[in-house]
Amino acid sequence: MRSVLFLCVKNSARSQMAEGLGRVIFGDGVRVQSAGSEPSHVSPWAIQVCREIGVDLGGQSSKFVGTIDPDSVDTVIRLCAEEVCPATLSGKQHYYLPIDDPASDDPDVDPEEMRARFRRARDEIKEQLTSLAAILDRSETSA
């Protein structure tokens, strides 16, 4: 079974949404997981906006990338800039999805703006994963 690992720093928002969306988009033939270099918690905003489209992140948790067995991963998908994203798992197929971090520590960001930011990130991730699924399918059939 093919395996995809989504990476970002905190494994809180983008990579968690990508993990949940990836399970739906890639289907049962792909094992999907996520991790970060400084894991924290799954963002309640990520849980909420994914639930809006029927994707449940409830069983997911933030994980440290060092706990992932490198032999269990075929493809690494980074969702943060290379200079801050954990660089790991050499020898694997790598992709970069440039998705802006929707999270903010700014107390002036109101709940509606925060929800809009997370929805925008969710929709960008969904669109890019849909395109990537076709690429992964082609590389699987040509292998």
What is each of the regions a protein language model found here?
Residues S40-V42, E83-P86:
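Short, charged/polar "capping" segments at the starts of alpha-helices
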Residues L57-I68, V73, L79-V84:
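S-adenosyl-L-methionine/SAH cofactor-binding core of RNA-modifying enzymes
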